[in-house]
């Protein structure tokens, strides 16, 4: 989702000198988008990747050890709307774990969603973007990507006024719930529009059928 009337802001970004653009990747399991890793961005960007799995953060840190110091920062934290304690629902595929319980009917009846089958529940500490940014003296969240299995909207709410510094948000949404109590597209869209953003496009549309595989709905 891209912010309305951001031409002036984009022009200002082009003119930045000696100031880093902060790329926030929440749910960074498996690594960062290649478009950001390019060495031409090493001197103008800082990437902050969040994942609740400390082992995964350690793996990512090792895999990017040859990048300049401070360019990629792996943060082993779970984000939510407010700091505190939350349950983390660990699923068969760790990348499908969520702050919300997976819907059992789906993993039982849709083969492509067996990955969301619940394995265990643990209690974890969570924080929010505003608190984390303040404690790390970060003033802007220039680009935000969120893929956190249903908790995306509350993470955005936890950014508070820092959303005013954001130019673009790449966020996973669902039209039908995969997790109990999760936010859906219409709620996320309404929240972002109320904060000055407008929808740019929907990509990677997927339909989960009762067959073995998910169905990609994107046009060529």
Task: List each model region and its residues.
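Phosphate/nucleotide-binding beta-alpha loop and adjacent structural elements of enzyme active sites
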Residues: 1-220
